[in-house]
Every structure is written in C-alpha cells, then in structure tokens.
C-alpha cells in the first residue's frame, strides 16, 4: 500500500480554524487545539446571542412604549388592546420610534 501524507488537507483545515480565530487573544488565536475549542464556543455564542438580541430589542421597545403611554395615564396593555380593536397594526419597533420622535402623532394613536 502506498503511503498517504495528509499534509495539505490537515494544513488547510487548521488554517481555516486559525483564520476564524485570528482576532482572539493569546493562545486562542495561535495554538490549534485551543483555537478550535474557542472557535466552536464563539460560534455557539454568536448563534445564541442573535436570538437574545431580538428579545432584548423587543423588551426595549415595549419599555419605551409603556413609558410614553403612561404619560397619558394608560398602560401598555390597554394601549395595545385599543390599537388592535381599532385595527391599527403597527409593530412595536415602529410604535417605539413614533413615541420617541413624534409625541403628537403618538398621542393621536392613543386617542387623546
């Protein structure tokens, strides 16, 4: 049987892993084994945090809408209920932007 050297394939695989972790500190960017572990950890963290970012922004928008609604003596819950009854279908991001940038428009949405 002929001898098969894995030099090129292994080098290419290691090079890709080290390229992924090039900005990391210390051994996490230079040593293959620790770089591989750190690269896997970073990918799982980024996947998890993409979902977390969506939740965090939704919480922020709801907080802003609630704060703006309470200036007019209404709670967030009653505001959303009234908007659905009147068939005003604005998402929370748009409502939060309107509450911050155009208070007059937001007060007309409240029905004041």
From Swiss-Prot:
Chief place of localization: plastid
Alphabetical list of PROSITE patterns matching this protein: RIBOSOMAL_L20
GO terms for cellular component: chloroplast; ribonucleoprotein complex; ribosome
Disulphide connectivity of cysteines: none
Signal peptide: none
Entry annotated with the keyword Transcription regulation: no
Compartments where found: Plastid, Chloroplast
Source superkingdom: Eukaryota
SUPFAM superfamilies xref list: Ribosomal protein L20
GO molecular function per UniProt: rRNA binding; structural constituent of ribosome
GO biological process: ribosomal large subunit assembly; translation
Keywords: Chloroplast, Plastid, Ribonucleoprotein, Ribosomal protein, RNA-binding, rRNA-binding
Functional summary from the UniProt entry: Binds directly to 23S ribosomal RNA and is necessary for the in vitro assembly process of the 50S ribosomal subunit. It is not involved in the protein synthesizing functions of that subunit.
Similarity remark: Belongs to the bacterial ribosomal protein bL20 family.
Protein name: Large ribosomal subunit protein bL20c
């Amino acid at each position: 049987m002929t001898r098969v050297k894995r030099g090129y394939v292994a080098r290419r695989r290691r090079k890709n892993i080290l390229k992924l972790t090039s900005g990391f500190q210390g051994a996490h960017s230079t040593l293959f084994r620790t770089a591989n572990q750190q690269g896997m950890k970073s990918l799982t963290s980024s996947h998890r945090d993409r979902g977390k970012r969506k939740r965090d922004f939704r919480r922020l928008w709801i907080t802003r809408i609630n704060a703006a609604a309470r200036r007019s003596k209404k709670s967030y819950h009653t505001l959303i209920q009234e908007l659905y009854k009147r068939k005003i279908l604005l998402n929370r991001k748009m409502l939060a932007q309107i509450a911050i940038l155009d208070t007059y428009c937001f007060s007309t949405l409240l029905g004041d």
